[in-house]
Design a protein with these regions (language model features):
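Soluble metallo-hydrolase cores and metallopeptidase-like ectodomains found primarily
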Residues: 148-167, 222-297, 309-312, 320
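Noncatalytic luminal/extracellular "stalk/propeptide" segments of secretory-pathway proteins
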Residues: 66-69, 73-179
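Short helix-loop-beta-strand segments that form the rim/entrance of peptidase-like active sites
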Residues: 84, 223-226, 312-336, 359, ...
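Extracellular/luminal Protease-associated
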Residues: 89, 138-235, 401
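N-terminal hydrophobic or amphipathic helices/low-complexity stretches enriched
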Residues: 21-98, 103, 108, 272-275, ...
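Metal-dependent peptidase/peptidase-like ectodomains
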Residues: 292, 318-319, 328-435, 443
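Catalytic-core environment of secreted peptidases
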Residues: 62-81, 89, 104, 108-109, ...
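His/Asp/Glu-rich mid-to-C-terminal helical/loop segments that flank catalytic regions of hydrolases
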Residues: 432-507, 514-515
Length: 515
């Protein structure tokens, strides 16, 4: 592996690009080790063996808040380009975040082997868009992630043509789709497949309408030649239009998307203890990037900062098992960093990871203490034991908790698909707090758990300090437990049937729908 000095780190993270409305991974580049220009040797003999209570006691909200203030300043460096603070992939705010994480780890001496894993990504930015359906501007229209622009980045006009079934087969597209705008129902196949089908049939653009009332935030996936400009609209507007078309009414449409698709480089940052059994590693991570719409201080500044603070405090101890920390890039664009890492592990390296713990959004203002409801029947063996560790800790603190399902929206996904036990905790995103949850956790029923999820207001005021400190202590407990021993934890096994069943149930891959 190439060794880079700390002084060369900025050059290593010189990432060029623009706001990513969509992004997709490309082939592997191996991790490269980094070394500090003033590396300090660590005397392990003087350190006590890892102890959960001691590591938890080292966590303070004051230290976390200081890191949050730095993250917000990083986001502010993007204001000139984006018009507001952001740490989105490709921005100076994200570049500064990566440098800060890596430099903080390098300053800890040789306790960790710090490395970066570089990979190219295709990202797209939508600058302007407009969709007119039957002489009315669509209020729910959202361009699909990684959509190409309309021809010549100009408006295109045509009749709306209702596609048969769900537009998953070539036979679903009537001949009169050619030169017009395809109107396609969501379901049965991926959005990208629908766009390809419409493109091959000669449509100028495609509109996919939801079967649910909600807006349709989706992605086409890796760009291919036959993709055409594609929108998603909500089910209320979609049903109204579809019913009229089904009744034989003629409706026209105007579609316009000005978008750019380009490729940049980004990195995952990794740190593994030099000490501890390298064949039995506990791994944990959060994502380093945010969305273009805001600074991303809770999502996932909170999780990535919690993981970093635990990494810093862990250096006070010696460990029996290796601990591997990760800060994933491009999570908001489809879990690309964690997918990239997990999919390219050799079989030998895969088996060394005993479990992966995902920490995404630790400080939602209207929080609930959430645990992924992993079971060994539906996830790799060990996932249930990890779930129970979180349950036992919350109970020991006299705290309530609630279970949430795996839904494919965070970085545990790639590990489960790779057969690695996984789980995690969270405090909630756009889910509405129930009355029962209000009684369990306080806050306000009827409001989002994070009212600023994926918005400009996800700033320093969008952090619940109580939840953040509590959950960071739980992260410390999870690390300390497995850094000490895997006694009673299932050994790794290959579980292809479980992995296959998991993959077939996911409609999300990251924050956006894929089908």
């Amino acid at each position: 592996m190439a060794v880079l000095s700390k002084l060369a780190l900025a050059a290593s993270f010189a990432l060029c690009g623009v706001s990513a409305a969509g992004i997709q991974q490309q082939p592997l580049t191996a991790p490269s080790s980094l070394s500090s220009s003033h590396e300090t040797a660590v005397d392990y003999s003087s350190k006590p063996l890892i102890d959960s209570e001691a590591l938890q006691n080292a966590i303070s909200i004051d230290a976390l808040v200081k890191r949050a203030e730095k993250f917000y300043k990083f986001a502010q460096t993007s204001e000139e380009e984006y018009g507001h603070p952001t740490r989105v992939i490709g921005s100076s705010g994200h570049e500064e975040t990566l440098n800060y994480i890596a430099n903080t780890l390098l300053d800890l001496g040789d306790y960790y082997n710090v490395s970066v894993q570089e990979f190219p990504v295709t990202l797209s930015n939508v600058f302007q868009f407009r969709l007119v359906l039957a002489d009315e501007v669509s209020k729910s229209a959202i361009p699909m992630g990684l959509t190409p622009p309309t021809k010549d980045k100009e408006p295109v006009h045509g009749d709306l043509v209702l596609v048969k079934n769900s537009g998953c087969n070539a036979s679903d597209y009537p001949k009169n789709v050619k030169g017009n705008i395809a109107f396609i129902r969501r379901g049965e196949c991926a959005f990208g497949d629908k766009s390809i089908g419409a493109g091959k049939a000669g449509a100028k653009a495609a509109v996919i309408f939801n079967t649910d009332p909600e807006e349709l935030h989706g992605t086409l996936g890796l760009p291919v030649e036959d993709h055409i400009a594609t929108f998603g609209i909500d089910g209320v507007e979609g049903k109204k239009i579809a019913d009229k078309l089904a009744d034989g009414e003629s409706l026209d449409a105007i579609a316009y998307i000005d978008a750019e698709v380009k490729q940049i480089q980004t990195v995952n940052v990794l740190a593994q203890t030099e000490q501890g059994d390298p064949d039995n590693c506990v791994m944990l991570g959060g994502h380093s990037d945010g969305v273009a719409e805001g600074p991303g201080i809770n999502d996932d500044g909170s999780g990535s900062m919690s993981v970093l603070e635990v990494a810093v405090q862990l250096t006070k101890f010696k460990v029996n098992n290796c601990v591997r920390f990760a800060w994933w890039a491009a999570e908001e664009e489809g879990l690309l960093g964690s997918d990239f890492y997990a999919e390219n592990l050799s079989e030998e390296e895969n088996q060394k990871i005993r479990l992966f713990m995902d920490y995404d959004m630790m400080a939602s203002p209207n929080f609930a203490y959430q645990i992924y409801n992993a079971t060994n029947a539906e996830s790799p063996a060990g996932s249930e034991e990890l779930r129970n560790l979180y349950v036992d800790w919350y109970k020991s603190q006299g705290l309530n908790y609630t279970f949430i399902p795996f839904d494919g929206r965070s970085d545990y996904d790639g590990f489960i698909r790779a057969g690695i036990p996984a789980g995690g905790i969270a405090t909630g995103a756009e889910a509405v707090k129930t009355k029962e949850e209000e009684e369990m956790f306080g806050g306000h029923a009827g409001q989002w758990l994070d009212p600023c999820y994926h918005q400009l207001c996800d700033d320093l005021g969008n952090l619940n300090h109580t939840a953040w400190e509590v959950n960071t202590k739980l992260i410390a407990h999870s690390v300390a437990t497995f850094a000490l021993s895997f006694e009673g934890f299932p050994k790794r096994e290959v579980e292809s049937e479980t992995i296959s069943a998991y993959g077939q149930t996911m409609k999300h891959h990251g924050p956006k729908l894929i089908l």
